[in-house]
UniProtKB/Swiss-Prot annotation:
This is Variant surface glycoprotein MITAT 1.5. GO terms for cellular component: plasma membrane; side of membrane. Residues 388-449 are annotated as: Disordered. Residues 1-22 form the signal peptide. VSG forms a coat on the surface of the parasite. The trypanosome evades the immune response of the host by expressing a series of antigenically distinct VSGs from an estimated 1000 VSG genes. Disulfide bonds join 37-161, 144-214. The keyword Cytoplasm does not apply. Glycans are attached at residues 74, 95, 329. It is a lipid-anchor; GPI-anchor. It comes from Trypanosoma brucei brucei. The keyword Lipoprotein applies. InterPro entries: Trypano_VSG_A_N_dom, Variant_surf_glycoprt_trypan_C. One of its GO terms (biological process) is symbiont-mediated evasion of host immune response. Residues 414-423, 435-449 have a biased composition (Basic and acidic residues).
Length: 474
């Protein structure tokens, strides 16, 4: 009996000397849980970072459009002292940068949305895993995440996951100050993912305290199922942790083994993924964030740099260049003006062609009877000859007055001297001895006496268009 007591005393002494990990092996080791929480926080920060970065870049691109719109050729130019040594070079650079970056706005916004969404989804998967284990605490002191001592992990020890007690409602949101602070920096998601495999793996489960193990990580009949063992592999967080049904005593003293996240968990072991960066939800986040970073880097600070150069050249370093609607549309207005002038020119040409066709009939050399039968002709008794009736002729389209000069000029034909006598010194020329202008269909290549009102109507039309454009500018 005394001998038995001595044996019992020795056994108790040995048990009390075992390290906390062995004696209180209730589940997930603190270092592993902390690595998972850090990954989750950084994924949320990455989502915020992508959204903020895209917003900033798009704002800069639109601002570049704004300031460049004011950089018109006749604007006040900077000098070398203003940091603008070559105005034209800055103008061209700003134009090219604006065109290239504006074309990327839609793609940038789409890429940022995908990256942020994937990072947020991956963080959610890890949060669900940690939340389930953190809440698993029994009345007799059992738990699924061990703290730094012999008790369960606290929210302070899991600060990258929780802001209060270990409840899902207290997990860090994307708007949490901790996430915002992390979003101001940069991180390598692949490195953080691999850290989940390395942290707290080798000594997480060992010893012979299986009866105290976390049931959420055991596949035997006294584990995650009631009264029966699993029929296959159970996976947490898309394979971050896996365990199977074999082994009557649950977790063996051989500890945790590391296999690919897709491997089947056989035997007594609990398998941590040796390749967390390849877990589908994490791999997707890493890939889409990388895609966004590549696109964002192609834009970089180009728009911002161009803005500063433009402001210097516009002598606006210390003031905001306001958006002027007319300047934003200078090119458009020029095109529309040219189009309007072309259309007006065509219309005038058609009118002149009709006028030529409707010019007064030739009444010369007609006898009295024939003259009376010819429309537009009448017999002049005093002179005894056939002449055009008074009031015939086409109206001037610009002034609305009758153009009685057409026949007056054309009757002289190639007689230059007679043509020029029709003009009164000091007054606008009535006739001109010249070749035909654009739109004149009557022998345009031949020099002869022609009506001067053709140019008058076109000059009036151009003056109307010019006045309208100047009204827009001022």
């Amino acid at each position: 009996m005394i001998h038995s007591n001595k044996v019992a005393t020795v056994v108790l002494a040995l048990i009390s000397s075992w390290p906390a990990d062995g004696t209180n092996n209730h589940g997930l080791k603190l270092q592993k849980a902390q690595a998972i929480c850090k990954m989750s926080k950084e994924l949320k920060a990455t989502a915020m970072r992508a959204a903020n970065d895209a917003k900033l870049k798009i704002t800069e691109i639109l601002e570049l459009e704004n300031v460049f719109a004011a950089m018109i050729p006749n604007a006040t130019k900077g000098t070398e002292a203003d940091g603008c040594t070559d105005y034209n070079a800055v103008f061209l650079e700003a134009n090219n940068t604006a065109a290239e970056t504006v074309s990327k706005i839609a793609t940038l916004a789409e890429s940022a949305t995908k990256a942020a969404g994937a990072a947020g989804r991956a963080a959610g998967v890890l949060d669900e895993f940690i939340a389930a284990l953190a809440q698993a605490q029994g009345a007799t002191g059992l738990y699924c995440i061990q703290g730094s001592g012999t008790g369960a992990a606290t929210h302070t020890e899991l600060a990258d996951c929780f802001n209060g007690d270990l409840k899902p409602r207290n997990m860090l949101s994307i708007r949490d100050p901790k996430v915002s602070a992390a979003a101001t920096g940069s991180t390598d998601l692949t490195t953080l993912a691999k850290a989940m495999a390395a942290s707290g793996t080798d000594t997480t489960f060992h010893g012979d305290q299986q009866s105290k193990g976390c049931g959420l990580m055991k596949g035997t009949s006294d584990g995650i199922m009631i009264g029966q063992a699993l029929t296959g592999t159970f996976a947490w967080a898309q394979g971050l942790l896996r365990f199977g049904a074999l082994g009557a005593n649950g977790i063996a003293s051989t500890g945790v083994t590391g296999y690919a996240h897709t491997a089947t968990a056989s035997g007594n072991g609990v398998h941590w993924a040796s390749d967390p960066e390849k877990i589908p939800v994490i791999a997707e986040a890493i890939a889409l964030v990388s895609n966004y970073n590549t696109l964002a880097d192609s834009i970089g600070t180009r728009a911002k740099d161009a803005i500063e150069k433009v402001k210097k050249c516009m002598k606006a370093t210390n003031k905001e260049i306001k958006r002027e609607h007319i300047f934003l549309n200078v090119s458009h207005l020029n095109r529309e003006l040219q189009k309007a002038v072309t259309e007006l020119d065509k219309a005038l040409n058609k009118q002149d062609a009709k006028a030529e066709a409707k010019q007064q009939p030739n009444c010369d050399d007609k006898k009295q009877i024939e003259c009376g039968d010819t429309p537009g002709c009448g017999w002049h008794k005093a002179e005894g000859k056939c002449e055009a009736k008074d009031g015939e002729g086409q109206k001037n389209q610009a002034t609305g007055e009758k153009d009685a000069n057409k026949n007056r000029c054309t009757q002289h034909g190639t007689n230059k001297e007679a043509c020029e006598k029709e003009n009164t010194p000091g007054q606008s020329a009535v006739c001109g001895f010249r070749k035909g202008k654009d739109g004149e269909t009557d022998e345009p290549d031949k020099e002869k006496c022609r009506n001067g009102s053709f140019l008058t109507s076109k000059q009036f039309a151009f003056s109307v268009v010019s006045a309208a454009f100047m009204a827009l500018l001022f």
